[in-house]
Amino acid sequence: MSKLFLDELPESLSRKIGTVVRVLPSSLEIFEELYKYALNENSNDRSGRHKKPRIDVSSDLLKTDEISETNTIFKLEGVSVLSPLRKKLDLVFYLSNVDGSPVITLLKGNDRELSIYQLNKNIKMASFLPVPEKPNLIYLFMTYTSCEDNKFSEPVVMTLNKENTLNQFKNLGLLDSNVTDFEKCVEYIRKQAILTGFKISNPFVNSTLVDTDAEKINSFHLQCHRGTKEGTLYFLPDHIIFGFKKPILLFDASDIESITYSSITRLTFNASLVTKDGEKYEFSMIDQTEYAKIDDYVKRKQMKDKSMSEELKAKSKSKGQATDGTADQPSILQEATRQMQDEKKAGVFSDDDEENDQNFEAESDLSDGSGQESSDGAEDGEEAEEDDEEDDEEEDKKGQSALNRDNSFASINGQPEQELQYKEFKEPLELEDIPIEIDNDDDEDDEDGSGVEYD
């Protein structure tokens, strides 16, 4: 039997077969038959025989795959699409004329802008997400493996107007005319998605969901920046999303290795997510009030918080001391949060301060040079500014006087001045009463003869 077929195989596989043949020479014939069979099957696939029908998602297919009322599962008109393109389009679920499989497409009239086939394999993740500060809107977010002609790769993000969607559902006869709960629309869309082969989650309908580990995960979102772009960071049971300005970021929660907090102030902090591949993504200007929720999410997902180790290293470098490695020390972020809570309890920011701030803002609006005030108002503004300058000078003098009093306790050559004065006057002092003459005259010229100098 010829051994020439071994030369056609990968070197590692050829060596393994050779080892078997040396032990069992009769096996060479079996290996050669297997090789010939594989060649025949490969040629059959190329010629189209024994080949399972599949959809070739191309523009030629789309010309024959028409959409009509008979094969439409669900249609929602005038949806505001934000990604991968920005247009008002129609969202359509329908059954393909080619093989009857479900398809999602975005239409502009009769023109297809984006089509996704094989939904059970192509849709990787889909979810409804709230729109911050706009309760009448909701996002529908979807990621996919490929689309028609591979024109796009970015996630699909569209905004649904709750009122308009409710009206469309009522006009289509999908809801009764007296229904006002938008969740009925969400439930219907989710059911259609399940029938077509994928799931759309709705994590914010109930703020608490249950993940695969049977642990309660609170879904929440917060405002932050990535570089110069402001966006929303969504923490979901299995994913973290930042959007919706390009590039949109989607993380699988299980792919996050660690989190690090930095640039911590009394009001904000930064958080950096580090993936298992070593990629780092920093999000800045996060409000301090969001820390507890992030910390709880991180702990439940068993992500590593590397902030403490970096803080201890920084302390050891600045103080020249070795790190003791105590993991129980409160982090800087926790200290800042505690300080902010203490200040609120102590009433550091009083109502008077807020009133002063409002007055200041109001005065700023009137003196911004926009030309909306009359000339008399401008003159009054100038006089007010002069009065303010005089008041500022007087306040400066008072402040300097207070500063001088405070400085009486400052150290001189490392020794407190108070101690020097005490040493200087160890002997008892004899105090002498000094008579003070009181001027009862009611002159108008009291200032000149009062004995008190005014600045």
From Swiss-Prot:
- GO terms for cellular component: chromosome; nucleus
Positions of post-translational Phosphoserine modification: S408, S411, S450
> Sorted alphabetically, which SMART domains does this protein's record hold?
Rtt106
Q: Where is this region: Disordered?
A: 305-455
Q: Name one GO molecular function term.
A: histone binding
Q: Does the keyword Membrane feature in the UniProt annotation?
A: no
| Resulting phenotype, Q288A | Decreases histone-binding
Q: What is the effect of changing Y291A?
A: Impairs histone-binding
Q: Per the UniProt entry, what are the Gene Ontology biological process annotations, in alphabetical order?
A: chromatin organization; DNA replication-dependent chromatin assembly; heterochromatin formation; negative regulation of transcription by RNA polymerase II; transcription elongation by RNA polymerase II; transposition
Q: Polar residues bias: where?
A: 319-339, 402-418
Where it mainly occurs, coarsely classed, is nucleus
Q: Where in the cell is it found?
A: Nucleus; Chromosome
The record, for InterPro entries, names:
PH-like_dom_sf, RTT106/SPT16-like_middle_dom, RTT106/SSRP1_HistChap/FACT, Rtt106_N, Rtt106_N_sf, Rtt106_PH
Q: Which Pfam families match?
A: PH_18, Rtt106_N, Rttp106-like_middle
Specify whether Cell division is a keyword of the entry: no
Residue ranges constituting the PH domain according to the UniProt record: 68-200, 217-301
Q: According to the UniProt entry, which residues carry N-acetylserine?
A: S2
Assembly behavior: Homodimers (via the N-terminal domain). Interacts with the SWI/SNF complex. Interacts with the RSC complex. Interacts with the HIR complex. Interacts with the CAF-1 complex. Interacts with RLF2. Interacts with SIR4. Interacts with YTA7. Interacts with CAC2. Interacts with HPC2. Interacts with HIR2. Interacts with MSI1. Interacts with HIR1. Interacts with histone H3. Interacts with histone H4.
| Miscellaneous remark of the record | Present with 11100 molecules/cell in log phase SD medium.
Q: What does this protein do?
A: Histones H3 and H4 chaperone involved in the nucleosome formation and heterochromatin silencing. Required for the deposition of H3K56ac-carrying H3-H4 complex onto newly-replicated DNA. Plays a role in the transcriptional regulation of the cell-cycle dependent histone genes by directly recruiting the SWI/SNF and RSC chromatin remodeling complexes to the histone genes in a cell cycle dependent manner. In cooperation with HIR and ASF1, creates a repressive structure at the core histone gene promoter and contributes to their repression outside of S phase.
Q: What is this protein called?
A: Histone chaperone RTT106
User: Lineage, please?
Assistant: Eukaryota, Fungi, Dikarya, Ascomycota, Saccharomycotina
- Protein's gene: RTT106
